């Protein structure tokens, strides 16, 4: 089936190319219902400490069962305090402070900067954009630049890379950013250059130039 082919592709990329795949989890007003250890939860009705710990455990299971490399928590809607509680729970398992530090713990956000309390527990914090622009890029106060990843939305500009190259070139005034990215990356397969993923490949070379021996 197509699912088996996709799973085999993921494993090949993990094992041969070093690509890491993470689960998308919500800290927003979606996907609030889940079951763990035979108990049903609905975070839209109750986000007490027990429910938050259960949500973290459910996420961990979703990551480990298929062999993913971590989780990206999409923060768009929850309060800052609820996000911190979830990340502290997830941080017991994944990320720099977790039982399995090789598993990535990432938070992504759009408008308001997340609370700095999450920093020790996270490998990366991703700043998203929903437009084809670069001028707004800023390093958020008190966040380590090496943990920050800046992502834009291709929209209809996937054929020439949109602002991806500018994102790759941009650096904060102090330090070096953790990286950049786009949504959806797959669209750049149809690069107007005729080379699949041409602009994305160039962005990688800008940030991590190949070494000539």
Residue ranges and their predicted role:
Residues 2-167, 174-177, 185-206:
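Chitinase-like catalytic core of GlcNAc-active glycosidases
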Residues 205-213:
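C-terminal domain-boundary segment and adjacent tail
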């Amino acid at each position: 089936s197509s699912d088996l082919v996709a799973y085999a592709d993921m494993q090949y990329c993990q094992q041969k190319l070093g690509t890491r795949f993470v689960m998308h989890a919500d800290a927003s007003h979606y996907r609030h219902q889940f079951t763990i250890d035979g108990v049903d939860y609905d975070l839209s009705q109750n986000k007490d400490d027990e429910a938050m710990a259960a949500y973290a455990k459910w996420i961990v299971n979703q990551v480990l069962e298929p062999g993913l490399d971590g989780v990206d928590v999409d923060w768009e809607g929850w309060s800052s305090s609820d996000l911190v509680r979830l990340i502290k729970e997830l941080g017991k398992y994944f990320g720099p402070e977790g039982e399995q530090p090789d598993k990535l713990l990432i938070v992504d956000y759009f408008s308001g900067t997340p609370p700095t309390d999450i920093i020790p527990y996270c490998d990366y914090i991703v700043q998203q954009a929903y437009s084809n622009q670069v001028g707004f890029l800023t390093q958020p106060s008190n966040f380590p630049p090496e943990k920050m990843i800046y992502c834009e939305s291709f929209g209809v500009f996937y054929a020439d890379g949109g602002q991806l190259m500018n994102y790759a070139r941009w650096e904060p005034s102090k330090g070096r950013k953790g990286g950049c990215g786009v949504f959806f990356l797959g669209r750049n397969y149809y690069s107007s250059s005729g080379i699949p993923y041409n602009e994305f490949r160039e962005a990688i070379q800008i940030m991590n130039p190949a070494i000539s021996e």
